[in-house]
Curated annotation (Swiss-Prot):
Segments crossing the lipid bilayer: none
SUPFAM superfamilies recorded: Actin-like ATPase domain, Heat shock protein 70kD (HSP70), peptide-binding domain
Modified residues (Phosphothreonine): T198
Top-rank taxon: Bacteria
Record GO terms (molecular function): ATP binding; ATP-dependent protein folding chaperone; unfolded protein binding
S-S bonds: none
Entry protein name: Chaperone protein DnaK
Pfam families for this protein: HSP70
Biased composition range(s): Basic and acidic residues: 630-661
CDD domains for this protein: ASKHA_NBD_HSP70_DnaK-like (cd10234)
Length: 688
């Protein structure tokens, strides 16, 4: 039987760990290092090198050496920012809009999943050599804020590497496993994970073997590389000002700048000033040029002020979503090499008010947590319960473009949620299920994850068919959507994978815009609902007039039709012109007109009942001989049929006033009423 390991697939570095003797152990790679650079390169001979060997050739072979591809995995080219495209190698868009990295040495293009698979393969091979047995399975960690497609792409990378991916685990959750496995008392912790390319913050309750995530937030396009780029830009701007040459346009010079920036960043975590010397960085007509300068810690912190602001916001959002104050946090666990920067530690102190824990290795704790999860799946731990959450709300598009949320963000997974929907048109034989992800009220403002159709719905008036839509999120965070016609039993489903994905900038924009434009979203939603109610009231009026004409004759209906038709026409014009005030006025007038029609019908019934009472008394005293002469009118029986129809159903549900009586009569019918359309639609049900 093959071995199972835990892998932290990082943007900058990756780590592999395994359970030994009931404890997680980090496995050193073939070069003797406990961390492996997430770098893949191809030498002059076309040989593939991974890890530290690939990193050594980045300066001399920048176009054929690929790093930080985790930022591209599961994403589309049009989602990349100009900043994320600024790397020494070439990024291209394929025919379907996905991201490819070009390798001139092999005259070939690779997907980000393929490059990541090469790193995973290196880690698995090194682990196999250490364990003396083949590694066949893995628990792989991803940022908590990775969306569905990014998680699926990570799983695909594992499959390409020949691994069975047993679980996709959120990085902060993995860190909490390694931190709190042996802790008995329950405490509330905040995991602050700032890695090379991603940032996550999660709040958990940990203790007695239970790890429950309360809230998560983050930014998958923020990490240590962004702090490096601040130094790169500072150096390049200085050189451009003094020498008139932009080093960022030279691939080799750019790679040297990036290496020097990372080195300076690391040194400034221990000292207050560092020297940066890059001899022969470029050459002009005047000869070779050198870059020599000094950078202080205070200068570096000033350059990164905006990045610290981006770090601060997710922490506040996670606290708000969890319903906690900073003083409710009992422990802060720092994860990721970038948390070693003094300004980051100080930011955590300022936000939470306590000293961060130094009990775990920020580079290794995530892989150790992944190994523990592998042990849980293998049955090595019997009394450990892990409750993770989904980072963004999931729902579908309802009538009018409104997003109907089925699974709110920070819902514990695995989870299944369902709701009942119906058709929006008469005799509609199919419905389209449009799955969206985000926090805005309107579906068009959120991210589309996929679409599929359910066919074969029996013809019926709008609102009568019942379509049950179910969302299932498994423990890996992978979403499956199922639609079921409850009348016919027909079912259609889709697993959301390979769809257009969310960039972190889009995620942050969705949440920020949802807060900024909450009032605007609410007004738009109310406007759509008002339009839907108005259109339904117009249809109700037309239906009632037809029924009245059938029961009482055209003359009775004609006297009342003109007013209702005029008001309906005004309401339609107001809807066409988007005149909110006109819609409100015409809607109220139409309600009144239909109420008056209802009142007259009930009054007509009351008079009919009085006539029947006198006829009964006459029969008692006179006998049956007058019946042949004075036969009852057929319309009497027909009126009872009309009376027992549920005309007040829609009216009482959406449009009626609570103080007004119903159209229904409790008097038993004299004969079975003529069949009419009925439905059992609830107030909370929505129309697709």
């Amino acid at each position: 039987m093959g071995k199972v390991v835990g892998i932290d697939l990082g943007t900058t570095n990756s780590v592999v760990a395994v359970m030994e003797g009931g404890k997680p152990v980090v496995i050193a790679n073939a070069e003797g290092m406990r961390t492996t650079p997430s770098v893949v390169g191809f030498s002059k001979d076309g040989e593939r090198v991974v890890g530290q060997m690939a990193r050594r050739q980045t300066v001399l072979n920048p176009q054929n050496t690929f790093f930080a591809v985790k930022r591209y995995i599961g994403r589309r080219y049009n989602e990349l920012s100009p900043e994320s495209k600024r790397v020494p190698y070439t990024i291209r868009k394929d025919d379907v809009g996905n991201i490819k990295v070009a390798c001139p040495r092999l005259n070939k293009e690779f997907a980000a999943e393929e490059i990541s698979a090469m790193v995973l393969k290196k880690l698995a091979d090194d682990a196999s050599a250490y364990l003396g047995a083949a590694v066949t399975g893995a628990v792989i960690t991803v940022p908590a804020y990775f969306n569905d497609s990014q998680r699926q792409a990570t799983r695909d990378a594992g499959r390409i590497a020949g691994l069975e991916v047993l679980r996709i685990l959120n990085e902060p959750t993995a860190a909490s496993l390694a931190y709190g496995l042996d802790r008995g008392d329950t405490e509330t912790i905040l995991v602050f994970d700032l890695g090379g390319g991603t940032f996550d913050v999660s709040i958990l309750e940990v203790g007695d073997g239970v790890f429950e995530v309360k809230a998560t937030s983050g930014d998958t396009q923020l990490g240590g590389n962004d702090f490096d780029k601040k130094i790169v830009d500072w150096l390049a701007e200085q050189f451009l000002e003094t020498e008139g040459v932009d080093l960022r346009r030279d691939r080799q010079a750019l790679q040297r700048l990036m290496e020097a920036a990372e080195k300076a960043k690391i040194e400034l975590s221990a000292v207050s000033i560092t020297d940066i010397n890059l001899p022969f960085i470029t050459a002009t007509e005047d000869g070779p040029k050198h870059l020599e300068t000094r950078l202080t810690r205070s200068q570096f912190e000033g350059l990164c002020a905006d990045l610290l602001g981006r770090v601060r916001n997710p922490v506040k959002r996670a606290l708000k979503d969890a319903g906690l104050r900073p003083d409710d946090i009992e422990e802060v666990v720092l994860v990721g090499g970038s948390t070693r920067m003094p300004m980051v530690k100080q930011l955590v102190r300022d936000l939470i008010g306590i000293e961060p824990s130094e009990n775990v290795n920020p580079d290794e704790v995530v892989a150790m947590g992944a190994a523990i999860q592998a042990g849980i799946l293998a049955g090595e731990f019997k009394d450990v319960l892990l409750l993770d959450v989904t980072p963004l709300s999931l729902g579908l598009e309802a009538i009018g473009g409104v997003m109907k949320k089925l699974i709110p963000r920070n819902t514990t997974i695995p989870v299944r949620r369902s709701d009942i929907f119906s058709t929006s048109e008469n005799n509609q034989n199919s419905v389209e299920i449009h799955v969206v992800q985000g926090e805005r009220e309107m579906a068009g403002d959120n991210k589309s994850l996929g679409r599929f159709k359910l066919y074969g719905i029996p013809p019926a008036p709008r609102g009568i068919p019942q379509i049950q839509v179910a969302f299932d999120i498994d423990a890996n965070g992978i979403l499956q959507v199922t639609a079921l016609d409850r009348t016919t039993g027909r079912e259609q489903s889709i697993t959301i994978q390979g769809a257009s994905t969310l960039s972190e900038s889009e995620v942050n924009r969705m949440i920020q815009e949802a807060q900024k434009y909450a009032d605007v979203d609410r007004e738009r939603k109310e406007r759509v609902e008002k339009r839907t109610r108005s259109e339904a009231l117009i249809l109700q009026g037309e239906r009632q007039l037809r029924e009245v004409a059938l029961e009482f004759g055209m003359q009775f209906a004609r006297n009342r039709r003109q007013r209702i038709d005029n008001i309906s026409r005004e309401l339609k014009e107001s809807l066409k012109e988007n005149d909110d005030r006109g819609i409100d006025q015409a809607y109220a007038d139409l309600q009144d007109a239909l109420y008056e029609l209802n009142r007259e019908v009930r009054q007509y019934y009351a008079e009919d009942e009085d006539d029947d009472l006198f006829a009964t008394i006459k029969d008692i005293f006179v006998g049956d001989k007058d019946k042949e002469r004075d036969l009852p009118r057929d319309s009497y029986r027909e009126r009872d049929s009309y009376n027992n129809r549920d005309y007040g159903r829609d009216y009482g549900r959406d449009y009626g006033r609570d103080s007004r009586p119903s159209y229904d009569s409790n008097r038993p019918p004299r004969k079975s009423p003529r069949p009419s359309y009925q439905d059992n639609w609830d107030d909370d049900d929505d129309w697709l």
